[in-house]
Amino acid sequence: MVKKLSAFLLIAACCCFSMGETATVRTIFKDGRKISKSVKLEDVSESVKRLTVPKSELSGDVRFIDVVADFAPAKKGDDGYWIHARGTYGKFDKDSGSYGMSRQVIPVWGMKTPSAAFWANVRTYRFDYQFRVEVKNGNYEVFARFDIENVRKWFEPYNDIVVDFNLLSGEDANYSGMGRGYRKFQLERGAVRTIKDRIKDFPELDYLCDAIVVRIQTHAAKPIPEKSIDFTKETELPVVVHMPFGVAEEFVKALKDAGIDKLSICSAGWNFGGYDGRTPQHLPVCAEAGGEDALRRFIETTQKLGFQISAHATLTDCYTVSPMWSPDYVGKYPDGSLDSNGLWSGGKCYRVCQKASYNGWVLKELEDIRALGFKGPHYIDVYSATYPNRCSDKNHSATPEEMAEYQNRILARAKKVFGGAASEAGFDHVAGNIDYINYVDRVMKQYEDHPEKYPLVSGVYPLWEIVYHGIILYNPDRLTQNHTRGRCLYKLEKSGDPRWMEGDGITDPKISLKIVEFGGRPIFYTYKFADVGRIKKAYDEFLPVRRLQRELMESHEEISEGVFLVKYGDGSEIVCNYSKMPFKYRNENVESLSYKLYDGKK
């Protein structure tokens, strides 16, 4: 009976979809004109419909192309929600307002409305669209806005716009179904492999699943200057030592003595000039932190204690103070000017073209770093924390899609050389070649710090986690890092600033619970012995649930106000209770601000 009902619902949903299988394409021109037209969607399958906007329609006077699903209208008071790539969602409960995100960790957005549930898969220009929610007089419009003007700053439009709308029905007609759908898409096309599948090829990954990451932040670093400066050897700021290699040996011993059996140490600031100091050059080893012999002893000591230790590397940033400095490998605009972004320890930061570095020095440098003794997930900063850069240099021109391919080639080589690879955040253009990330995104922290800026946002669901749990190891958000240290005393985002390691000491049980609910694992950035006990506390919190790191997350739902049920592929279930009262599940009480694990293997 259940199967017949599900089949009926699928047929009914598809019929409804067929009756309205159009999308509105709205062209916004540079002079402010707008032209909208209804476009019939192409049948890819019974439940997948494709929108194509030919590149011939992306002429020089086009600024934006908006893509709106006609078949899922929503207004205030409707049951359901819109959902963004990270899992940020909003209920249909506002009269007016707007929300937008210019960057998406996965090229997906979705809606659940009274008439339809779907997830949209952006197949082209995934690095060039904004996610938008606009509400006027209680009517919601949720759409992708393709920034054609920005594409043209670098290249003439080189692809059609292609968006696939995936219809959901029955038990799949929710954000869990959206996540499972995109995960299936990624697995079936070979873009990613599960952890269980990869372990046979990368045994270091098996250890990593049971370990938390402690990132020594940093051994040494120059202070971040106040002004954007092209430093020289004569004008650069001095390196400040935070945890020299000899002291780091004592630090890892203290962690072992605290009773921690498995850790993956990420050594940041070991390199030439300290953290972000003189990249793209990493060698020789930072003399101020102790030099190569001391680093080798630190690595050897760490490994003898039974811990992993890997190196932090920065391949996207370069500075004029580096002995390797050359404008030849820097990404360039069409007019030949250098692509720069940000201000870090090395001064004004320029973006390295990954095509140029791959065909230049990077592959050899990976081997040279491995020769120091590092083994485990080689950490390459930034790759998964933002979009790939672009380059119009005629000698190594690359679209962001091509740049992503070179990032993946470098990560794949790192996996072969070190036994694994890692990066910073959850942007999934490199998902097939990373084992862990430091955090998925920073939206939870943003919403908590400034809720007044996001009136349309109701919260965050683990959409990304349903896609990638059991594929990539992660911590959910900047908000949930270093959580047993308390909240950061300073309102800053730059982890290269030592003040980022200062906590207020006030722990919040809701943060610990959020890590469990979202299937994450703790991570610590530190150079202080005062954090040893805090790291041990975080590790103890992780122990009861760490075996689930190898499992796929199958669903997440709110089963009562403030109570969430998470199901895993092996049959395990976790109930997380944020409410003020105990919640009864399976005839057992789940106490307030706690969780209970129901082990699927028992």
Model-inferred region functions:
Residues 211-363, 375-376, 384-389, 395:
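Aromatic-lined carbohydrate-binding/catalytic grooves of carbohydrate-active enzymes
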Residues 85-86, 273-275, 290, 470, ...:
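Glycine-centered flexibility motif
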Residues 1-5:
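Positively charged n-region of N-terminal signal peptides that target proteins for export
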Residues 111, 115-116, 121-178, 185, ...:
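Active-site-proximal substrate-binding groove within the catalytic cores of carbohydrate-active enzymes
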Residues 8-16:
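Bacterial N-terminal signal peptides
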Residues 21-264, 270, 308, 589, ...:
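Carbohydrate-recognition beta-sandwich/jelly-roll modules
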